[in-house]
Amino acid sequence: MPRIPTSVLGKYLLSGQISRQGCVGARQITRHSALPSAAVSVANSARLLHVSSETVPPPPAQPVPLRKQLKDEAKKAKKQGKKKSKGDSQTVDGWELTVGIEIHAQLNTARKLFSPAVTSFNDEPNSHVALFDLSMPGSQPLFQKETLIPALRAALALNCDIQKLSRFDRKHYFWWDQPSGYQITQYYEPFARNGHITLLARDGISPQDGESVTIGIKQVQLEQDTAKTLAQADKVNWLDFNRVGVPLIEIITEPEMHHPRTAAVLVRKIQMLLNTVDACVSGMETGGLRADVNVSVRRTDGSNPSLGTRTEIKNLSTIKAVEDAIIAERDRQISELEAGRAIPSETRGWTLGSNETRRLRGKEGEVDYRYMPDPDIAPLVIGDDLVDHLRRSLAVSPDSELDTLIARYGLTAKDALSLINLENGSRVQYFYKVLKSVEEKLAAELTEEEMPEFKSYSTLVGNWIIHELGRLTTFKAGPLAARDLSFTPEGDCLQVPDADLAQLLYHLVRKQITGKVAKELLFAIYLNEIEGGITQAIEDNDLWFKEIPEEEYEKLADEVMEGEDKVLQEFVDYKQFPQGKLMYLVGKMMRLGPTERIVPANAERVMRAKVEKLRSE
């Protein structure tokens, strides 16, 4: 590629202008109706909600999200039947792994740490830069007090002791993304110390860690982010100084983890905690949270009581990368030591999809960074009244919310954890809104005696929000399926409004529509093809459930039993009731009759009565 002209670079660096040459405009996807027309005959529209069969042109190619790439790779590996390697194990016989983690998280603030410039991640490059951000002569740091609030919430969520007095230090190094030649951090006197976080078996920790494991948090400190580097052709790098000076917290754990999976779970849980308390709403998938891991190994025979030489793996950007990088580095160190070679202290890198780490540079020590107190910034004094207020107003912890979802709402531990983790907690807010609307609609229409058991519909709502909404974006949903659903932090879904889903599930709970009709109605909502509301769509298309009468159940059961003498004999001779054979006969009833008008429980009841009668004859 030709070198980028100096004029183009100047426009970018000085005014944030980007050449739009080569941009590809997105094509618009053709719409089609998921609802049958009211003018179509009842025979074609009644009972079922059909999707139009007209040919739809394929959508334009879209970048595949990283999460989907990882899932696809895992499925492919499983399909090919790859054998587990040594690195797949959480332990290696004769060796102990020790891991410590440093997490860098961007705080949810409107201003930078030491300048009034706004924080922005999507605006034009270099459009939010103050003089101090560029270290212009004569500019001075001005601590933005509001940045302290989310930092304190994060430290409290991690059970840290807040220090009344803390100070800022300069960490010296020279690189193009740090114009001042040093980073302002809190190396000697951080604002929070001595925290801890407890990981439970349901969080997904390694089985070797038992039911729970508690990891110490050494300290939490405030610091600045660096500029964003955009690599170009011919070894040219562009810099976006919008990010320089953005407030970060660095969370440093104690080296107390001994299994790769547990370390990955720790990062995921800290990310969830920070989002819950509104300290960091941008996760690893968007670059708002990065992890560095320190890895060392030693023999378990007692020949080396002290920890081994540690290496640091920098800038891991996914949960999976944390686990995979630790496994790869552990196995590398063991191989080196078994070959009689020493492990140098160094910084290493990791590439997604790789099976080994790579050397970046020798490990820089404390002397190299020349830490010194920053003489331009006054000590940070934090009052007990502020800490007490934030502690009282802190959001419910994910563990407490998980217990509530399981005990009160009847969700499984796996579903409850998914609900909390999806969309950084926005999906669980959506769940509460939909469930509240369903409950209010039921209470308005039914007497107290008629009201169904709470858990019977709370679990239904949960299953639909976790599983049925997820199916909307899979390849099975057809060419109009989007990559992801969009949720706001308040719990609003842009594609499936909570009011529409609540109305749909209300009719399903009342057994006024079948599950199949409900699923196709949901897809119609997703495509924005419903006009006049859910109830009107059901009415216009004659989709109300009309169950067959009792005598038709009896007739279907009799027809199914004909020619099944061998199966029926098992109901006469059994020692243990053959439930599987019963469901086989019920399945034949469903296929023989009008499926959309049959209640499976009623079909099972009628068939059970008939086969039990055989034994008494």
UniProtKB/Swiss-Prot annotation:
Keywords recorded for this protein, A-Z: ATP-binding, Ligase, Mitochondrion, Nucleotide-binding, Protein biosynthesis, Transit peptide
EC number(s) from the headed UniProt entry: 6.3.5.-
Record carries keyword Transit peptide: yes
Catalyzed reactions per annotation: L-glutamyl-tRNA(Gln) + L-glutamine + ATP + H2O = L-glutaminyl-tRNA(Gln) + L-glutamate + ADP + phosphate + H(+)
GO BP: any one term: mitochondrial translation
Disulfide bonds listed in the record: none
Transit peptide interval: 1-56
SMART domains, per the entry: GatB_Yqey
Region (Disordered): 53-90
EC supergroup of this enzyme: ligase
Gene Ontology molecular-function annotations: ATP binding; glutaminyl-tRNA synthase (glutamine-hydrolyzing) activity
Keyword hit for Protein biosynthesis: yes
A single cellular component GO annotation: glutamyl-tRNA(Gln) amidotransferase complex
Cellular compartments annotated: Mitochondrion
Main location group: mitochondrion
Bias kind Basic residues: ranges: 76-85
Family the entry assigns: Belongs to the GatB/GatE family. GatB subfamily.
Self-association and partners: Subunit of the heterotrimeric GatCAB amidotransferase (AdT) complex, composed of A, B and C subunits.
Purpose: Allows the formation of correctly charged Gln-tRNA(Gln) through the transamidation of misacylated Glu-tRNA(Gln) in the mitochondria. The reaction takes place in the presence of glutamine and ATP through an activated gamma-phospho-Glu-tRNA(Gln).
Protein's name according to its UniProt entry: Glutamyl-tRNA(Gln) amidotransferase subunit B, mitochondrial
Organism field: Fusarium vanettenii (strain ATCC MYA-4622 / CBS 123669 / FGSC 9596 / NRRL 45880 / 77-13-4) (Fusarium solani subsp. pisi)
